[in-house]
Amino acid sequence: MTQGFAALAAGEFESARALFKKAEASPFDNGDAEEGLRQIASRETNQIVDRLRQDSEIALENGAWQTAIDLLRELAALTPRSVAVKAQLNMAEERLALESEGQGYLDDPLSLQSDEQLQRARTWVVNVSRLSPPKGQMSTQLIALGRLLSLARSRYDVTLTSDGMTTVKLLRAGDNGALGSLERTRLQLIPGRYTVTGRRAGFIDVRTDFEVPPDGGSILIDIRCEERIP
């Protein structure tokens, strides 16, 4: 028993466990072996808790939200009464959700064509700007999304050409989308996705999808019905 507790004090848990189990099988054991095994389990748990605390703190500082969440969930299972751990877990989950939302706007900037999506993105910028550090990737997302928002309602030239016999319509433009028959016209459109259609009696309808990027550019779309209906 003395050897077992000496090994335990030295942090040699495997050696201590083997000695306590051997003593536990002895008819002379008075319960000390069980106490020794309990202390080993407690010390091992404490070591795990300390490691999880350290690793989760590092993950939070680095803005590695998913890693922090995984570690904090393990830690919460071992320390269910810890209010601090629950608070950190909630923070990491909220910031992961915010980071994912911000990345969604950056991955699909043309979605800001929608007024509703634009307002959500603006709200995201306000909310993230008010967060205390750490912000992780959201710091760079703020800069990138701020630029996109500044361009979201800029208007860029789009030139449409046709044959003067095709009836042209720009979808997503309401009543203003009916352009009639034309040979050449210039539109000013905000960044987004558009569809232009063409109709002509006796000919197959045509349709062209195009995009206006956030930073504009030279866009020329030709739309005309040329294939006769069999």
Task: Please describe what each predicted stretch is.
Residues 2-12, 17-28, 35, 42, ...:
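Short loop/turn and low-complexity linker motifs enriched in small/turn-promoting residues
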